[in-house]
Structure formats: structure tokens, C-alpha cells
């Protein structure tokens, strides 16, 4: 039985197979590939895109979705996550999609289930489906020619699980990862080139990925205001002028902090394309994990 906890759970060949399936799901035509299958979603952190994307993907494939309301679940009565998941597993779901603020929690639940677990984000650690849809967006834009392409990931690269997953995934496809952040948000490793402002590197980039400031993961205030942060890290029309790069953002976008209003309308900005691709990629992942499950 296969789970998706981090992007390394899939080989490069498996990822390319997922992309092949995802292309077929881009037209959003309903089908019955997963008819009779039941998928449980457990979101202990807020989500708009990821949760809705999984739900729409599942329903387009003919599966049923059961959303556990964590606000009224027995975890509020003191039940452990392990007991909660073990009880859900006893009901016979075909997959469990989970998001939690605790790093490593989805992986720790594997021994309690007989179905695939899909990590929809665990604290600062990992967000594998987001990284896969980001890569799919890049891969399709460059017609599969990703070797040697350069990306700047801009913003809170220390706390962002999206940055973490992309740091691990994109180099597998030959993409040169560069990190741009203020000192307080810098990645603590040394295997990537790091810069202080986007202006230093933007001329050399094929892709720029802007990130949301992870305010909910900070214990102290680093900037007097988000506007102060935006001076060096917001993607503005001035930065876009005369340049041809792909602009990505995992969402939600803080307008005029991460990306300006004007740039969000620019055809080089692929934020909504990422969302569309996310449904197709997650549909392909659900198909793979559920149909290949050998209990």
C-alpha cells in the first residue's frame, strides 16, 4: 500500500505517469473511475484551495467525500488523533486526506490504517500535492523541458511547507532552486543559493514563486507592517517589465504584499492556472493511490 506523505514517496517515473493522467483530467469531465469509493478528509488547519480541490477531484472521479468536522469531532473531547483515525479506518474508507499543524503527524498515522493517507499539509514540513501541481504547471509551460531552468522562491522560505516540498522536488527535474528572503525568513540549510531581495536575481529567472508570509507560524513580529516587508518582496509591474518569466503563488495571495493587483492580472501570472491544475493533479493522485491499493 502506498501513501503520499512527501514528494519522495513517488519516483520520477510515477510523477510523470501522474502528469499524463492529469492532462486527461484537465477538461473536468465527470467519470466513474472511483465509483463506490469513499474518501475522508480531516482538515485541522484552514484550507480553501486544497480541500475544495480534493473534493472536486474526488467527485469528478465518481467517489464520495466524507468531511469530518474537526470542530465537533471527538478530538475535542480528548480522543487522540491515533484513536480518531483508527476508528475512521474501521469504517472502511478508501483513502484519508489529512492536514494538521503538527509536523510528521500524517506519517505517524500510517500504522493505524488500511488505506492510503494523503498529506494535505503538516505544519512547516511538507505539502506534496501543492509541489506536484506547481511542478506540473512548470512542466507543461516548458513542454517538459525543465532541465536547467531557474526558479526563485520568494518570501518566508523557512516556515513555508510549500517551499520545503518544492526545494526537495524541483531539483529532481533539473530545476535550479534559488531562495530569496529576509534574514529572519531564510532557509537554515546551505545547499541552495540564497539572496536578500528579488531584484538581485530576477533577470536570470525562468520562474518566480511568491510565497505568503506564514504569520500563524511566527512567535514574534519581524516587520512593523506587511507593507514594510512588501518593499523588497512584492512582485510589482516594475519587476515584471521587460522580463519573461512564469509567476506562481500557492495561495492565498496577500494582494499588494506578495503580488500587486496589477500583476495578478498579467498573463505571465499563473495563479489561477495552478488552481485548475491542482484539481487535475489531485485527481490523478487519488486514482493512483486508491486503485493501486492492495490490502
Curated annotation (Swiss-Prot):
Cross-referenced SUPFAM superfamilies: Aspartate/ornithine carbamoyltransferase (SSF53671)
Group of enzyme by EC: transferase
Keyword set, alphabetical order: Pyrimidine biosynthesis, Transferase
Catalyzed reactions per annotation: carbamoyl phosphate + L-aspartate = N-carbamoyl-L-aspartate + phosphate + H(+)
Positions contributing to L-aspartate binding: 77, 161, 212
InterPro entries: Asp/Orn_carbamoyltranf_P-bd, Asp/Orn_carbamoylTrfase, Asp/Orn_carbamoylTrfase_sf, Asp_carbamoyltransf, Asp_carbamoyltransf_Asp/Orn-bd
GO cellular component annotations of the record: cytosol
Its EC number(s): 2.1.3.2
Pathway linked to the protein: Pyrimidine metabolism; UMP biosynthesis via de novo pathway; (S)-dihydroorotate from bicarbonate: step 2/3
Gene3D superfamilies for this protein: Aspartate/ornithine carbamoyltransferase (3.40.50.1370)
Pfam families linked to this entry: OTCace, OTCace_N
Residues annotated as binding carbamoyl phosphate: 49-50, 99, 127, 130, 251-252
Biological process annotations from GO: 'de novo' pyrimidine nucleobase biosynthetic process; 'de novo' UMP biosynthetic process; amino acid metabolic process
Domain of life of the organism encoding this protein: Bacteria
GO molecular function: amino acid binding; aspartate carbamoyltransferase activity
PROSITE patterns the record matches: CARBAMOYLTRANSFERASE
Subunit (UniProt): Heterododecamer (2C3:3R2) of six catalytic PyrB chains organized as two trimers (C3), and six regulatory PyrI chains organized as three dimers (R2).
Protein role: Catalyzes the condensation of carbamoyl phosphate and aspartate to form carbamoyl aspartate and inorganic phosphate, the committed step in the de novo pyrimidine nucleotide biosynthesis pathway.
Family per record: Belongs to the aspartate/ornithine carbamoyltransferase superfamily. ATCase family.
NCBIfam families recorded: asp_carb_tr (TIGR00670), PRK00856.1 (NF002032)
UniProt-recorded name of the protein: Aspartate carbamoyltransferase catalytic subunit
Protein encoded by which gene: pyrB
Amino acid at each position: 500500500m502506498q501513501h503520499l506523505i512527501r514528494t519522495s514517496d513517488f519516483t520520477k517515473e510515477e510523477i510523470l505517469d501522474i502528469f499524463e493522467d492529469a492532462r486527461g483530467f484537465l477538461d473536468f469531465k465527470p467519470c466513474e473511475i472511483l465509483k463506490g469509493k469513499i474518501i475522508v478528509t480531516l482538515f485541522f488547519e484552514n484550507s480553501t484551495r486544497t480541500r475544495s480541490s480534493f473534493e472536486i477531484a474526488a467527485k469528478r472521479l465518481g467517489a464520495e467525500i466524507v468531511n469530518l468536522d474537526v470542530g465537533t469531532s471527538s478530538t475535542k473531547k480528548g480522543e487522540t488523533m491515533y484513536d480518531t483515525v483508527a476508528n475512521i479506518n474501521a469504517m472502511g474508507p478508501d483513502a484519508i486526506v489529512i492536514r494538521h499543524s503538527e509536523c510528521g503527524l500524517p506519517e505517524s498515522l500510517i500504522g493505524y490504517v488500511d488505506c492510503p493517507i494523503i498529506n494535505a499539509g503538516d505544519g512547516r514540513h511538507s505539502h506534496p500535492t501543492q509541489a506536484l501541481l506547481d511542478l506540473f504547471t512548470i512542466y507543461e509551460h516548458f513542454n517538459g523541458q525543465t532541465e536547467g531552468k531557474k526558479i526563485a522562491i520568494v518570501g518566508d522560505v523557512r516556515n513555508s511547507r510549500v517551499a520545503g516540498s518544492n526545494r526537495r522536488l524541483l531539483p529532481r527535474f533539473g530545476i535550479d532552486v534559488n531562495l530569496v528572503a529576509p534574514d529572519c525568513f531564510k532557509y537554515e540549510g546551505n545547499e541552495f543559493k540564497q539572496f536578500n531581495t528579488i531584484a538581485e536575481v530576477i533577470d536570470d529567472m525562468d520562474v518566480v514563486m511568491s510565497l505568503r508570509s506564514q504569520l500563524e507560524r511566527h512567535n514574534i513580529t519581524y516587520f512593523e507592517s506587511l507593507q514594510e516587508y512588501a518593499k523588497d518582496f512584492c512582485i510589482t509591474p516594475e519587476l515584471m517589465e521587460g522580463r519573461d518569466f512564469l509567476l506562481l503563488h500557492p495561495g492565498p495571495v496577500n494582494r499588494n504584499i506578495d503580488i500587486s493587483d496589477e500583476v495578478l492580472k498579467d498573463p505571465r501570472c499563473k495563479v489561477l492556472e495552478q488552481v485548475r491544475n491542482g484539481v487535475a493533479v489531485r485527481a490523478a493522485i487519488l486514482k493512483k493511490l486508491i486503485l493501486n491499493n492492495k490490502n
